[in-house]
């Protein structure tokens, strides 16, 4: 089937071998928190910050060893290059608070990531599920002691990220997201943002190595309990990032449902050297459903591929579903992202761009529709074969569920 597909794509000037080779070189940063419903390992408080997991599927990882085992199994069923995306709340054996975290609290993660052949580790300060989230505020808090705690936490995370970069000889992306906002109409929208700006200034002034660490800031339109006002808005962060030469991270669940991250990516590529993504699937709101191979995901992948931005755009996944097998959630979402990238790589973007520039929109529409029915599935299966994987990952996951996950309950 693959040879027939190869010939069919060749009629359109598309090299399937080149597409497969390119796909194998695009790393995806896979989030650890799907495995334990964002619980973390540092004994933090119940989930807060407008974040919610729903469901009670058996087998949730309850400790570091179980989470490692689940990640190892799930990652073994995923094709392509992989990185691990960690939240700071996954510190191992830390007997200090989050503002005092050090590289040693993540040394076991480094050891594990190397053992399973990962390309690197990305990192996130954890500014939720903690007693120092006071009145829903962290880096924008009017309480200077609270604000200093979270500034120190972020600075600690930057130094931990330098450690990751040294260990893997690969830059570490550090994404700063805060839950700060108000449930109802605020009396002052400016001052909290000025406090956030001052906090970020202090964090960036800590002397971290910009060659090793890429700092990103992530906006959100609203969250549960912060429906009326979000301090870290899109406009605030895009201006701050541009002025301070850092990176914007786009989470496609963090915007109005009629806003599309696929349209935002090329807008930022016109000005930024690096754009970061948290790919999720929002259903009516930022519900963080498992990523599926659907239209907007394809459009996101197209903007990465056709703009030659596979090295500029840092792809990470961010979703958590506790209603289904968590390993299946991991593998399905990562596979969907890879499928979307391959689908875009199997497209003659130069031809389509030429039709657009000639204003031949009739031919453009026809060609775009033709691509949808080309034998993509045969190329995907060949890619999996070369990665020594099968399309049927569910059988392996069911076996692991029976032998390992059900024993946890």
Question: Where do the language-model regions lie?
Answer:
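Short glycine-centered, acidic/aromatic-flanked micro-motifs in structured strand/loop junctions
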Residues: 88, 178-180, 219, 252
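Aromatic- and glycine-enriched pocket-lining scaffold segments that form the walls
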Residues: 165-166, 171-185
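A structural/positional concept
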Residues: 153-155
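Surface-exposed amphipathic alpha-helices with a cationic face
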Residues: 75, 162, 200-204
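Alpha/beta catalytic barrel-like cores
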Residues: 1-142, 149, 158-160, 166, ...
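Acidic/histidine-rich catalytic cores of soluble enzymes
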Residues: 185-296
């Amino acid at each position: 089937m693959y040879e027939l597909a190869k010939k069919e794509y060749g009629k359109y000037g598309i090299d399937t071998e080149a597409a497969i080779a390119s796909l194998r070189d695009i790393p995806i940063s896979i989030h650890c928190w799907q495995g334990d419903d964002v619980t973390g390992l540092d004994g933090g408080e119940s989930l807060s910050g407008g974040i919610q997991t729903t469901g009670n599927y058996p087998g949730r990882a309850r400790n570091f060893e179980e989470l490692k085992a689940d990640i190892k199994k799930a990652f073994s069923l995923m094709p392509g290059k992989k990185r691990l995306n960690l939240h700071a709340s996954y510190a191992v054996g830390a007997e200090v608070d989050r503002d005092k975290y050090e590289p040693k609290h993540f040394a076991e993660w480094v050891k594990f990531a190397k053992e399973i052949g990962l390309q690197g580790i990305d990192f996130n300060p954890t500014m939720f599920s903690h007693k120092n989230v006071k009145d829903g505020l962290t880096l924008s808090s009017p309480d200077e002691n609270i604000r200093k705690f979270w500034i120190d936490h972020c600075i600690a995370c930057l130094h931990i990220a330098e450690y990751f970069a040294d260990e893997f000889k690969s830059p570490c992306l550090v994404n700063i997201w805060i839950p700060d906002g108000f449930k109802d109409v605020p009396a002052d929208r400016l001052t909290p943002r000025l406090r956030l700006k001052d906090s970020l200034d202090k964090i960036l002034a800590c002397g971290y190595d910009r060659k090793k660490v890429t700092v990103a800031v992530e906006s959100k339109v609203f969250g549960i309990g912060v429906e009326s006002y979000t301090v870290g808005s899109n406009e605030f962060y895009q201006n701050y990032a541009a002025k301070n030469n850092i990176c914007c991270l786009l989470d496609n669940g963090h915007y109005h449902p009629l806003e599309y991250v696929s349209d935002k990516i090329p807008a930022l590529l016109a000005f930024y050297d690096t754009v970061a993504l948290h790919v999720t699937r929002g259903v009516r709101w930022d519900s963080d459903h498992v990523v599926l191979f659907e239209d907007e995901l394809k459009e996101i992948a197209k903007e990465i591929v056709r703009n030659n931005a596979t090295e500029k755009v840092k792809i990470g996944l961010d979703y958590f579903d506790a209603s289904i097998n968590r390993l299946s959630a991991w593998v399905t979402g990562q596979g969907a992202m890879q499928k979307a990238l391959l689908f875009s790589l199997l497209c003659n973007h130069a031809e389509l761009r030429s039709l657009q520039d000639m204003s031949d929109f009739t031919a453009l529409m026809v060609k775009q529709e033709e691509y949808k029915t080309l034998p993509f599935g045969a190329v995907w299966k060949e890619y999996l074969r070369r990665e020594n994987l099968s399309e049927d990952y569910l059988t392996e996951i069911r076996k692991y569920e029976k032998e390992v996950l059900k024993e946890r309950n």
